[in-house]
Amino acid sequence: MDQRLGVLLACGHDRHPPKGRIDERTHRLIDSARIIGLGRAGRSLGLALERSGWTVDLVRRDAPVADAAAGCRLLVIATPDPVIASVAAAVDPNPDSVVVHLAGSLGLDALGHHPRRGSLHPLVALPEPEVGSQRLVGAWFAVSGDPAVGEVVEALGGRSVEVAEEHRVAYHAAAVVASNHLVALLGQVERIAAQAGVPFEAFVDLVRATVDNVAELGPGAALTGPVARGDWATVARHLDALEPAERTAYDVMSNEARKLASGASAEARS
C-alpha cells in the first residue's frame, strides 16, 4: 500500500479528473493533495485520504520542493516541526494552493509567505501508517486558517475544533499530557506491578474503564480511590511501599488528585 502511495501522481494536473466537488473560486477539484514528508503522520494522512477517494502525491522532504505547490489544490507539509518553516520557505507560493502543516504547537507564521495557509493537527496517536490511517477516520482535528482544512476533516468523517493562534502551545501541551504523559504514567504502573509480581495486563481493563468513566462523567466525578475518599493514611502507606524512584511521581499525582477532589466537592456543595 505504501508503494502505491509512493508513486508520484499529478495532483489533479495533466490527468483526466474524476468526479468530485468543485471549488467555485478556482474551478479545481478539491479531492487531491500533495504531502511533503514520508514520516508516520504524512503517510498515515496520505493513506487515509487515498482511501476516501482523494488523489495523493507523496514527496520526500529532501526532494526539490520549489514547485511543490504548482498545480496542487492542497499542499501538506508533514515534516518534523523544526524544519516546517524552512520547507515552507523553499516552496514557491501559489495563490491557488492552500499550504497546510500538521504541527500542534506551531501557528500559521511557520508557513511564511504563502497567501493561503492552514494548520491541521490530528488529535490521535499515529504509531505507523496502516493503523494511523484508520485512526484518522472520525478523529478530532485542531484547525486554523484557510477554510479548505475543513474539507480534509470532512473527507475523513472527522470533527474539528478551531484553536486561536495564541492558544496553540497550550492546546498542544494538553495533547501531550493526554497522550505522552499518560503513557509515562502507565510505564510507572508496569514497573510497580512488576515489583508486586502482578502482570501489567491485569491493569489494562482498569485503565479502559477509567477512561470511559472520564468520558461519561468528567474528571472530577470519575475520580475514585483513597484521595477521593480523603484516606491519606492509605496514601502514606503506598509511599512507604514504593521504591524511592517511584515516590515523586506518585506524590505529585496524589496532589493533583487532591485538587480534583476538592473541586468536585465544591461543585457538589454549590
Over which residues does each language-model region extend?
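NAD(P)+-binding Rossmann beta1-loop-alpha1 motif at the extreme N-terminus of oxidoreductases
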Residues: 2, 8-70
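Rossmann-like NAD(P)(H) cofactor-binding subdomain of soluble oxidoreductases
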Residues: 43-47, 62-132
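Internal alpha-helical scaffold of NAD(P)-dependent oxidoreductase catalytic cores
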Residues: 45-47, 52, 129-216
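NAD(P)-dependent Rossmann-like dehydrogenase/reductase catalytic/cofactor-binding core
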Residues: 201-270
